[in-house]
Structure formats: structure tokens, C-alpha cells
Amino acid sequence: MLSAFFKTAHCALRNMPIQTDLVGKWNFVSSENFDEYLKEVGVGWAIRTIATKTKPALEFAVNGDEWTMNSNSTFKNYTLKWKLGTASDEKTADGRDVSSVFSIENDHLVQIETGKGGGKDSRIERYIENGKLVIVCTCNGVKCTRVYEKAA
């Protein structure tokens, strides 16, 4: 019984760093292969053109078991709320309808988007590397990487 408690406590503590490190404001630094990723998930030319020129600022917050991500840019302001392990329907910033489930795997915040109405599935991983927020989006083998730095 006691060993089960320590195993659970260890897992909970192991999952905390991404939660604490992610909280706060992040400024856009760079993007690689974003247009190809957006094309693969089915985003049209006009939205892709705008989205690839946009440099959103992100802000993450955690309140109890609810997470929030705000994305603010000249193109669009977007808020996403979730609880780990719970599926939630959302309309993505680029207009796709998906069902998302978030989890923590190896200190990465992982979002699995399941496309609705014929939409494509996607995997989005967010993690901290060398003090920067790295976001890797993958759909059908097409991968993009976006990098942010913590706001002062």
C-alpha cells in the first residue's frame, strides 16, 4: 500500500517541471516548415499566408487541474483551455474542428488533435529546451518546429 503511494507521488512530482516551467509569457523567435504543416492539416492558402507571417505571443497558466493557453497576435487572439487526459472539442486558431486530448510524456506537454468531419489528425509537443519553449507539430510525417523565449 505504501509503495503504491510513493509510486503515485513520484509520478506526480516527475510531471511537475513542464507545468511550472511553461507558466508565463513567451515571445515568438522562429518557425521552420510551418506552411508545409498547415498545408498538410488542410489549412487553405489565404489563412496559411497570414499565419506564416504572424508572430504570436503565448501565455500559459495552470489553475488546479485546468490549463489555459492564450495566443495573441495581429492575426487572431485565441484561448485554449483543457484538463490533462480529458477530450475537449475545439476550433483551432486556423479554423479546423478537432477533438484534443492533452497528456504529459517525458516532461513534454503532448496534444493529440483528432480531426472532425474528415479533418486530419495531428500531434503537438511542447517542451522546454535550453530555457526556450519548443513546439513541434506533426501531421502525416510533416513536421514543423516553432521556438519561443520567455518574456522578461
Curated annotation (Swiss-Prot):
It holds the Pfam family Lipocalin. The keyword Secreted does not apply. A fatty acid binds at residues 126, 146-148. One of its GO terms (molecular function) is fatty acid binding. Keywords: Lipid-binding, Transport. Gene3D superfamilies: 2.40.128.20. One of its GO terms (cellular component) is cytosol. The keyword Transport applies. GO terms for biological process: fatty acid transport. Belongs to the calycin superfamily. Fatty-acid binding protein (FABP) family. This is Fatty acid-binding protein homolog 9. It comes from Caenorhabditis elegans. The gene is lbp-9.
